Amino acid sequence: MHKTYFIADLHLSETRPNLTALFVDFMQHLAPDADAVYILGDLFDFWIGDDERSPLIDTVKNQIRTLVQQGVPCYFIHGNRDFLLGKRFAGDCGLRLLPEYQVIDLYGEPTLICHGDTLCTDDLHYQAFRRKVHRPWLQWLFRRLPLKVRLKIAQNIRTKSSRDKQNKSQAIMDVNPEFTRRIFERFQVKRLIHGHTHRQNIHQIPPHFERIVLGDWGETASILEVTPQDIRFRQ
């Protein structure tokens, strides 16, 4: 049976081996039967450059490489935690990098996919930070810092982000409905799949739009399975 899987917000790190185990289980037991696998950002808890090496990174590369060698394409859209993941990493394992917005033909239904952070336009502080860290010259400079320095910077940013979230309302950290509606119209689609907010759900939006939100990974995995006949979340 034809099926495509979508995952996001795994936040893999050396400190949470249970998440890596869930990812390996997915890649070895579910993914090989798919037509394609789409990773919609935040595969890693943070990413400081393609020159970093670790057992976790090797494991992820090996799993993606094996899946691709089995004939299942694996696509990736950058998240807010791993936006520096680049062509070197992708080339090592056969991962296909996509732009921040991508329309795909999902069994006859044009479907827009993205990470989702760009939809949260009410979070003005985050959007300003996002614009700053996506400046090419700043990324060029960051990549040339020593690994230890980059790691320290990333850890500080992550700590500050966690602290800032405690002072933000849930509404601010969710998608802006009007902006999201304009995105539907801009790309001329009726279905949108994204992650980032960690609020797993399937929203039906009048008159005919569908917004599917991927969940984050914790005690269990959040996996969206799409077939020509059905859409469902698997755990």
From Swiss-Prot:
Entry GO CC: cytoplasm; extrinsic component of plasma membrane
Keyword annotations = Cell inner membrane, Cell membrane, Hydrolase, Lipid A biosynthesis, Lipid biosynthesis, Lipid metabolism, Manganese, Membrane, Metal-binding
Cofactor dependence is on: Mn(2+)
Hydrolase: present as a keyword of the record?
yes
Residues the record lists as binding Mn(2+) 1:
9, 11, 42, 198
- The main location class comes to membrane
Q: What does the record give as the function of this protein?
A: Hydrolyzes the pyrophosphate bond of UDP-2,3-diacylglucosamine to yield 2,3-diacylglucosamine 1-phosphate (lipid X) and UMP by catalyzing the attack of water at the alpha-P atom. Involved in the biosynthesis of lipid A, a phosphorylated glycolipid that anchors the lipopolysaccharide to the outer membrane of the cell.
The record ties this protein, via PANTHER family, to: UDP-2,3-DIACYLGLUCOSAMINE HYDROLASE (PTHR34990:SF1), UDP-2,3-DIACYLGLUCOSAMINE HYDROLASE-RELATED (PTHR34990)
This one is known as: UDP-2,3-diacylglucosamine hydrolase
Instruction: Tell me what gene encodes this.
Output: lpxH
